[in-house]
Amino acid sequence: MTKSTVLSSYKLFAFIFIFRLANSFAIETFFQADEFFQALEPAHHFVYGYGYLTWEWKQQLRSAIHPLIYVLGYKLVGDNTTLVCISPKVINALIAAIGEYNLYKFIIVYDSEKLAWITLMLSLFNPFNWYVITRSFSNNLEMVFTVLALRFWPWNKKINGRWYISLGFGFVSCIIRPTNILIWIPLGIWLLISIRITLKWVALSFLEVVLILLINTALDYYFYQKLTFPLYNFLEFNVFKNLSIFYGTAPWHFYIFQAIPLMLMLYLPLMIYGLKKNILLLTGLFYIIGFSLIQHKEFRFIYPIHPILLYFTARGYVKFKPKFVLIGILLNICIGLFFTNVHERGVIDLTKYLATQQTPSVGFITPCHSTPWQSYFHNPNLDTNSWFLACEPPLHLNKPSMEEIRHYRDQSDQFYDAPESFLQTHLGKDLPKTEQLVVFEPLEPLMNDYLGREYYECQRFYNSFFHWDSRRDGDIIVYCRN
């Protein structure tokens, strides 16, 4: 590699990083609770000693790799509230830039530099990426490690040092999310039938996996302060006990007719047009079929194959008329701006408002985890005198049936089953009467009728024109105590 090539690579990475840094700071909306409660809250709790730990972290289901990245950021910025909010945004931009830079490098190795440039540009202007890639989801980190592994994968069917780099990145992606193994099963079979297997190769690969497992165990021990094996705990909860269905089920075709169209938006026709029968197509199909068999489904669960979808989109792009593609890209930009700056912005506006007001206590009468917590507030007092409705799963059940799951009611369910009765039973008792209460617009009549003498509306934020969860429709409202 020449000096000019290295310089060009640095410039490209710097451009992508600056682009994603702007993207990260431009996001003013809420997507899903895991962005805050499965990475930032555990990291905040680890560094500062307070923050909300969901049951997954109490049960040690998650690898420490993801939150430890944010631990580094928090340790660097110290106790400054503004920097506590900013540091994850910078880290997320860096993670995204690493992913997209290596997507470009992967396509050069797999196909051509021309297609690599097109894939990168399509990735940068993809609205789902603009909406998701700089958020603190473990699926994003999983996707980045997947792309890194694909970049170094032995596509030329020759085993050398690149294989061991690929194996390392691929195995870490499976540690972060064990279901990522669905990508490596077809690729692994393809490799095994394409190369000459030697004892040295098997032994060195095995030793590398063992070494990574030992390092990961040490990281988990450091984070949890006890010897634990999150990979086993994850399998016990999701497979052996089958408790993941508590968080909802979706039809088998969810990923085909909902997730992929959402992830690609107006790129979808290009992706279909660019499909080619090869190992990447087989890998993508195997991954989607595997995830379709799992009852609990979410859009971001198939995010690790998004780079593969973009590769096929790029193939479709080179066959299509550029002017129509340009119109699609411009419309995609509008869609991305709507979801990052308009839809569900009230939740973030509310959190910023409460943080700047230094409210002494607040109660959230909302579906569980509807707002960020200490990763935005950074206020130890709120941990002791504030609350929100919880939604712990039925950990006492072992392989529950759908009927048992339907009959189990968490705290949030109990409230929405009978709001007034719940408030009569709990408010002012196990749920203290706080200085402020937060509700979504559908509960406005309840607040006015039942608590109108004690609380008055003191602030209101637009949140959404529509929402998949009717409990979160409309504005989000702050009530202050008289």
From Swiss-Prot:
Regions that span the bilayer: 12-32, 114-134, 137-155, 175-195, 199-219, 252-272, 274-294, 324-344
Pfam family, one: Glyco_transf_22
EC numbers on record: 2.4.1.-
Keywords assigned by UniProt, alphabetized: Endoplasmic reticulum, Glycoprotein, Glycosyltransferase, GPI-anchor biosynthesis, Membrane, Transferase, Transmembrane, Transmembrane helix
Membrane topology: Multi-pass membrane protein
GO molecular function: alpha-1,2-mannosyltransferase activity
Subcellular location: Endoplasmic reticulum membrane
GO CC terms: endoplasmic reticulum membrane
GO biological process: one example: GPI anchor biosynthetic process
Enzyme class: transferase
Predominant subcellular localization, coarse grouping: endoplasmic reticulum
Pathway(s) where this gene product acts: Glycolipid biosynthesis; glycosylphosphatidylinositol-anchor biosynthesis
List of glycosylated residues: 80, 242
UniProt record similarity statement: Belongs to the glycosyltransferase 22 family. PIGB subfamily.
Protein function: Mannosyltransferase involved in glycosylphosphatidylinositol-anchor biosynthesis. Transfers the third mannose to Man2-GlcN-acyl-PI during GPI precursor assembly.
Name of this chain's protein: GPI mannosyltransferase 3
Organism, scientific name: Candida albicans (strain SC5314 / ATCC MYA-2876)
